[in-house]
Regions:
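Feature recognizes metal-dependent phosphohydrolase scaffolds
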Residues: 1-161
């Protein structure tokens, strides 16, 4: 079979930098098991600047919402724990934190909030953290920062994003 070239690569200044995926991630790849996203596949897809279908984002939010609405307001944490704070839309910083801090499958994480605003990838941060939280309910703790309120997000760039 003859190899087919990608017509979208012809106009790229840096030919070795692949373009983002043209289509949103397939539902079956995101949710291979009912109500449990494949967080690793999502991480890979978002790292390539891939998109999700609006219906999949809503499904992810609803599953996440059902988990966090039952969590206590005050949490007691046993060490060891990896603490991550103030990501502010820096998705690639989150990836580095996960690399340095340890695999969420066997590392307890405490995220201190301020996931959104300032950076350009706030939505990607929320999507990935929600999918990790859904998979590891008892070892991923997400606190709400001051940027996770309507007043702050209306003044910064998350509303536009």
């Amino acid at each position: 079979m003859e190899e087919v070239s990608d017509p979208f690569l012809d106009d790229r200044v840096m030919k070795n930098v692949l373009p983002p995926p043209r289509f949103p991630m397939e539902h079956q790849k995101l949710f291979p098991k009912k109500n449990q996203p494949d967080w690793k596949a999502l991480k890979t897809h978002l790292t390539k600047e891939g998109r999700l279908a609006k219906s999949d984002v809503i499904e992810l939010i609803n599953i996440f919402k059902d988990i966090i609405k039952n969590e206590p307001t005050i949490v007691k944490i046993q060490d060891p724990v990896t603490i991550v704070g103030d990501l502010h839309g820096q998705f690639y910083d989150l990836l580095k934190c996960l690399e340095v801090g340890g695999n969420p499958e066997n590392t307890k994480y405490l995220f201190l909030g301020d996931y959104v605003d300032r950076g350009l990838f706030s939505l990607e941060i929320l999507l990935l953290l929600m999918s990790i939280k859904i998979n590891f309910k008892n070892t991923i703790i997400m606190l709400r920062g001051n940027h996770e309120c309507r007043q702050m997000t209306s003044n910064f760039n998350f509303k536009k994003e």
